[in-house]
């Protein structure tokens, strides 16, 4: 069993501010089942031409606490099924899918968000999303929801009736420029 310290960005992510502009497919083979990262922060940030994640079910997220910016600015990614992700220990989902403009399908049905405190900008600028099922989200510990759906221009309906916002201190511009929403259940 291998782990990381949670402070290093993986080698494949590089260190360019301009992002990764050549990788269209990422493959997680069987060997990833033995790797136990504690952070996936910025793992695929600015992979602007990434279109497919193969074998992502081999990525073991059991020990991950930080998923901040994991798919940030993955402009070309049309869908991602994260139904196998174990998010029980995650506290930070800030900008996790931010600026994934082509994202039309996102399966978060098994996300355990009971320990998450930061959802700031989680889906902002996801213009391709027309619907998003967050009915299983436990938001009791969340403090920051600022810009969570900012500029999600394709969203037509959103049901957040199960959201517990008791501890939220910032909801600024949460729905700003969500011009397509015709049904918002709070």
Language-model segments: residues:
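LRR flanking "cap" motifs
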Residues: 2-38, 42-45, 145
